[in-house]
């Protein structure tokens, strides 16, 4: 059986409060801190800050 890899599935949630999110993965060994990046939110039709959250 293969061992679990270093990549975790994460959810990037919009800081605009619209409830929109993107899913992606990240290498938890190389980037242990939380991700923050500007991405397009189609609900408000603007680029806003997205922050990392756990997938439920």
Swiss-Prot record:
GO MF, any single term: structural constituent of ribosome
The reply on keyword Nucleotide-binding is no
GO BP, one annotated term: translation
Keyword set, alphabetical order? Ribonucleoprotein, Ribosomal protein
List cellular component terms (GO): cytosolic large ribosomal subunit
Query: RNA-binding: is it a keyword of this entry?
Result: no
* Gene3D superfamilies (UniProt xref): Ribosomal protein L33 (2.20.28.120)
> Would you indicate the residue range of the signal peptide?
none
Q: Which InterPro entries does the record associate with it?
A: Ribosomal_bL33, Ribosomal_bL33_CS, Ribosomal_bL33_sf, Ribosomal_zn-bd
Give the top-rank taxon of the lineage listed in the UniProt record for this protein: Bacteria
Question: What family is this?
Answer: Belongs to the bacterial ribosomal protein bL33 family.
Q: Output the NCBIfam families linked to this UniProt entry.
A: PRK00595.1, rpmG_bact
Protein name per the record: Large ribosomal subunit protein bL33
């Amino acid at each position: 059986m293969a061992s679990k890899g270093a990549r975790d599935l994460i959810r990037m949630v919009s800081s605009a409060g619209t409830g929109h999110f993107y899913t992606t993965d990240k290498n938890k060994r190389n980037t242990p801190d939380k991700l923050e990046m500007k991405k397009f939110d189609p609900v408000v039709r603007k680029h806003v800050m997205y922050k990392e959250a756990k997938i439920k």
